[in-house]
Amino acid sequence: MKLGVVGLPNVGKSTLFNAITNAGAQAENYPFCTIEPNTGVVMVPDQRLNVLAEMYHPKKVTPTTIEFVDIAGLVKGASRGEGLGNKFLSHIREVDAIVHVVRCFEDENIIHVDGTVDPGRDIETINLELIFSDMETVQRRKDKAEKNFRGGDKKAGAEAELAGKIYAHLESGKPARTYDADDEEKEIMNGWFLLTTKPVIYAANIAEDDIGKDESEIPFLKTVRSIAEGERAEMITISAAIEEDIAQMSPEEKAEFLEEMGIGQSGLDRLITACYRLLGLISFLTVGEDECRAWTIQNGTKAPQAAGKIHTDFEKGFIRAEVVPYETLVEQGSMAACREKGLIRSEGKDYVMKDGDVTLFRFNV
């Protein structure tokens, strides 16, 4: 899964990306310092792997990962190619979801591109550029569908009609993801690859002094929360500067720091968890002396397709999946104990995987 980190210049986007990946993306106090997208892979925090590693003492522990892309900043007019707009829009097309960093702090030493801090205006600036780009796409689709319909393609009529509805929806300033499409319409829209259908998490970048405060005590957050709820997006609060510091700490130092701050989980861990939830992802686990590993799948994935994540042969020759819930395995202490008590289930090709399933796939090729 690939997530694009976006935001106006000087909102803390590259600072946050540095913290996410430790990739050292240049974070300077001027616009467009991130010209080509920096890509980094971050481990998905999963305490279950640590527990399993204590049980199995494997040669290797492999968490699942999410790929983050730091996408160049943009200005008004990006959809017309101004600033770094064309590159911004092409890079957005390649990601599965968008992490939109929004500045929610005052700092006279960090110049805002528009002179003042206004989260609502900043969100609108980026969202409108994405909407304008989608309007062009939808208009082209509508013109093509109408032409095909006149040429005798009856199915094209439905696409042209839908394109008209979506264009009007976008024109009213709403992202395509807030349009209540039925299954047939969703199938048509999937072929359009619209930017505003992508899931969004708003990362409200707050001042270090605001960490630990109630959301109601930070005036900027009310605006961001309202926008997120209105367009079916998620919002988390984060201090990019603090997260960058935490990223340099050892696990022990990090735990001590979070405890001192009165925070149960780092902002990055909350961001990654929110991304998982937003994209409808879960993890299943495999264990053994060689490796304990987490694997990412879409919620609703059936056993053969999950097996295919490990190796295509596992899916082709799938026989069955031997499954025990993580909690049961830990409670019993070993797979042998689970087997002895009849706690390992044998599941066929129609079994829908659950988060935390510890699984052994049987296959024959």
Language-model features, listed with the residues they occupy:
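Conserved G1/Walker A P-loop phosphate-binding module
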Residues: 1-111, 145
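C-terminal-of-GTPase-core extension/linker across diverse P-loop GTPases
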Residues: 2-6, 17, 139, 144-352, ...
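Short, intrinsically disordered, mixed-charge
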Residues: 22, 54, 90, 128, ...
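Amphipathic alpha-helical transducer elements in NTP-driven molecular machines
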Residues: 32, 46-49, 62-68, 82-96, ...
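Conserved Switch II/interswitch segment of TRAFAC-class P-loop GTPases
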Residues: 40-45, 72-82, 93-156, 169-182, ...
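Short, flexible surface segments
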Residues: 94, 354-355
